Swiss-Prot record:
One of its GO terms (biological process) is L-tryptophan biosynthetic process. The active site is at 8 (proton acceptor), 129 (proton donor). Keywords: Amino-acid biosynthesis, Cytoplasm, Histidine biosynthesis, Isomerase. Its main location: cytoplasm. This is 1-(5-phosphoribosyl)-5-[(5-phosphoribosylamino)methylideneamino] imidazole-4-carboxamide isomerase. It comes from Chloroflexus aurantiacus (strain ATCC 29364 / DSM 637 / Y-400-fl). SUPFAM superfamilies: Ribulose-phoshate binding barrel. GO terms for cellular component: cytoplasm. One of its GO terms (molecular function) is 1-(5-phosphoribosyl)-5-[(5-phosphoribosylamino)methylideneamino]imidazole-4-carboxamide isomerase activity. Its EC number is 5.3.1.16. The lineage of its organism: Bacteria, Bacillati, Chloroflexota, Chloroflexia, Chloroflexales. Belongs to the HisA/HisF family.
Amino acid sequence: MEIIPAIDIKDGRCVRLYQGDFAQMTVYADDPVAVARSWEAQGATRLHLVDLDGARAGHPQNVDAILAITQAVQIPVQLGGGLRREQDVESALALGVERVIIGTAAIAETDLVARLLDRFGEQIVIGIDARNGLVATDGWTVTSSVKATVLAEQMANLGARRIIYTDISRDGALSGPNFAALSELITPHGPAIIASGGIASIDHVRQLAQLGVEGAIIGKALYVGAVKLAEAMAVAHMTNV
C-alpha cells in the first residue's frame, strides 16, 4: 500500500480544512514547495495536491504553486480541485502532474469523464467524496442524491481504474477512516481504491493495508505529528508482504 502525503493549497499556502469547511482552516506552511520537498526527502513516493480555491471556483486557481511543486520534486504528483473541463485536465497534465482527479464532473458530465478516460487512461483518477454515503460535489458544498457505491460502479463501467474515496465527515478530524464504506468499494476486479480522510494513527494505516486499499492519503495526521511518514510507509510495506 502506498502512503501519499496530502498538500492542500489555498491562496498559495499549505493548509488543512476541518471536514472541508473553509471557515475552519489551519495554515501549516506559507511555502507548499518547501513542504513538497520535505515529504520527498522523507521518502514519499507520490504527493496528493488539492487546489482548494479551484475546487470552490470550478477551475484551477493555484497554478503557479502547482507548477513550482512539479518542477521541484522528482516524485509523481496527483492533482484535484476544480478540474471539470477537458482543457483544464490538459493544462494540469502540461504542468507536469502525473494523475488528474475528477470529482464533480463524474456526476455532472459523464460523457466528459468517458472521453477523458478514453484519452488519458490511468492518468485519470475518479475522486468520490461522500457525506453519509452520498456523493458531494462543488468543493463539497453540494450533497447529491447519488450513492458513492453507485457512482463507483458507474465509473468502473466507463473504464476507471482508480478511485480516491474521501469520507468528508472524517476529513481533517483525525477520527479514523470509514472502513465499512471502503470495504463496500473494494471488489476483486474493480478499480483500485485509495483511501482519504480520517487517518489518525499507525493502527489506521495497518487496518487500511489489511483491508486491501491501494493507497492511503494522509494529511492532518502528518502535519500534527500523529503519524510519522517513515513509520507509516514501513507498516504499509510490512502489511503488504
